[in-house]
Swiss-Prot record:
Keywords: Cell wall biogenesis/degradation, Disulfide bond, Glycoprotein, Glycosidase, Hydrolase, Repeat, Secreted, Signal. Glycans are attached at residues 292, 407, 441. Disulfide bonds join 151-166, 336-352, 461-466, 484-491. PbH1 repeats lie at residues 216-238, 258-280, 281-319, 320-341, 371-392, 400-422, 434-478. Residues 1-16 form the signal peptide. The gene is pgaD. It is an enzyme of class 3 (hydrolase). One of its GO terms (molecular function) is polygalacturonase activity. It is found in: Secreted. This is Probable endopolygalacturonase D. It comes from Aspergillus flavus (strain ATCC 200026 / FGSC A1120 / IAM 13836 / NRRL 3357 / JCM 12722 / SRRC 167). It comes from the Eukaryota. GO terms for biological process: cell wall organization; pectin catabolic process. The lineage of its organism: Eukaryota, Fungi, Dikarya, Ascomycota, Pezizomycotina.
Length: 492
């Protein structure tokens, strides 16, 4: 019974069933997010014989307008397809193999990040689900698996067996115990991993611990509609991030040695410190993600009045080439994107809220200190400290060249609209630039917007270490005290 209920709970996702009333209505969302409760309820609910709403789970009832016809419509979606035959291999606990054919048969998972689904406890202690539209680039698409063996994993202990033996892996409502990494480093070439339900983690007070690690070739990592990956950040947040305080996982989702692959349509919330570390990848595309660390904006008992989350970078990118990050929404408390090394990198269609903007750096003092060919384009930076920033570490060496910011809209920026600093230290800038890191061929095109405070432009270069900066269609207003020691003509 448990097995068939689990398979049934994914039918509206696999077959793309939409709410008959209106797409995006909270009734559809609650059936996706509360899939177990919905499946159990729908198994006995019949609109023709049940017209009262007594006994209906409050989470389903309140989000379906207290109307049995809406409940019935959503239940009909759950039952529109036949449940496939499921074989449970005795050698792999909690892994359900749903196909194992000699000729691979493709399958489709409908995915979307058009809405953020907030789950909160109502006064009655039932789960209330509210779908809140946000200014996030819509990334709704269909993912087609590669056929072969498809496995559904419901227990952490079964992940390693599935990684070794399955072409397509559906991770359903996984709880990773303390000190237990979701290790996806041994994936088969061409494998697909699909997150479903809510993925959660036990407490692990260790800065060297990585909750999720993935690598592979021609791999796809994605999520079905309504899934949530929750990093348990509130257990660690103390206002200090990686700068001090208690030990906490430094990078939540580590992507390394990944080639010709895609990561798409994931919803991640409440990561402890940095979210993604992208390292040593080639021809990797990351698309349509929602990173929501908004809960970390509030102070807690450990943060001394400051936001509880700190150093919560969305994406840290290093030693990677031909990397694309696109159509992604980030609400955090540090760099939205930070490129510290790599070549041929495109960051396009970003919505960055609450953090430190679109950054190159900091550069210097690392194993690789070269950034060549990075384009940030068609993006918004909102209610953040900085808009477009290049930062190099004081007293270190390296090189930054061929950087382009194009069609970037800024709003409510508090510190710097455009910021190039060669005096950077994590504890604070020195005010004295050094010239060990060269910065050349930097272009700002159609970078526009407004400041709430701070400086529209701040450029502090070392002696002869900056060259060939171009400003075209740049207009940032609302700040004061602009200061640019390069170019010789002054600030834009």
């Amino acid at each position: 019974m448990k097995r068939s209920a689990l398979i049934l709970s994914f039918l509206p996702l696999v077959f793309g069933c939409d709410n008959p009333k209106s797409p995006g209505h909270s009734c559809a969302s609650v059936y996706s997010v509360s899939s177990a409760a919905a499946s159990s309820f729908c198994a006995t609910f019949t609109a023709s014989t049940v017209t009262a709403t007594t006994g209906v789970p409050e989470a389903l009832l309140s989000n379906c307008d207290y109307k049995t016809k809406h409940l019935s419509s959503a239940c009909s979606c759950l039952g529109t397809a036949a449940v496939p035959t499921v074989a449970t291999p005795s050698s792999v606990s909690s892994v359900y193999i749903t196909s194992a054919t000699a000729t691979p048969t493709s399958f489709t998972f409908k995915t979307s990040t058009a809405h953020i689904v907030k789950v909160a406890k109502a006064a009655t202690s039932s789960t209330a689900v509210v779908t809140t539209p946000v200014s996030v680039p819509t990334a709704s698409s269909s993912f087609t698996g590669n056929g072969g063996t498809t496995c559904t994993v419901t227990e952490y202990a079964a992940i390693s067996s599935a990684v070794a033996s399955c072409s397509n892996i559906l991770l359903s409502d996984i709880y990773a115990p303390p000190s237990s990494t979701i290790d996806l480093q041994g994936l088969q070439t061409g494998a697909a991993v699909i997150f479903a339900g809510k993925t959660t983690f036990g407490d692990t007070a260790d800065s060297d611990f990585d909750p999720i690690v993935v690598s592979g070739t021609s791999v796809t990592i994605t999520g079905v509609e309504g899934h949530v990956i929750d990093g348990n950040g509130a257990a660690y947040w103390d206002g200090q991030g990686s700068n001090g305080g208690s030990d906490k996982p430094d990078h939540f989702f580590v992507v390394k040695d990944m080639y010709n692959s895609r990561i798409e349509n994931l919803y991640i919330q409440n990561w402890p410190v940095h979210c993604f570390e992208i390292e040593s990848t080639e021809h990797l595309t990351v698309s349509g993600l929602t990173l929501n660390n908004s809960a970390g904006d509030a102070a807690n008992s450990k943060s001394d009045g400051d936001p509880a989350a700190h150093n919560s970078d969305g994406f840290d990118i290093k030693e990677s080439s031909y990397f694309t990050l696109e159509n992604t929404w980030v609400h955090n408390q540090d760099d939205c994107v930070a490129v510290t090394s790599g070549t041929d990198i495109v960051v396009d269609g970003m919505y960055c809220y609450g953090g430190h903007g679109l950054s190159i750096g900091s550069i210097g003092g690392k194993s690789d200190n070269t950034v060549n060919g990075v384009t940030f384009s068609n993006s918004q930076v909102i209610s953040s400290q900085n808009g477009c920033r290049i930062k190099t570490n004081s007293g270190e060496t390296g090189e930054v060249y061929n950087i382009r910011y194009e069609n970037i809209t800024l709003s409510d920026i508090s510190d710097y609209g455009i910021d190039v600093q060669q005096d950077y230290l994590n504890g604070g800038p020195t005010g004295e630039p050094t010239n060990g890191v060269t910065i050349a061929n930097v272009t700002f095109v159609d970078v526009t917007g407004t400041m709430s405070d701070g400086k529209d432009y701040y450029i502090l270069c070392g002696d002869d270490s900056c060259s060939n900066f171009v400003f075209d269609g740049v207009s940032i207003t609302g700040g004061s005290g602009d200061n640019c020691n390069y170019p010789s003509t002054g600030c834009p």
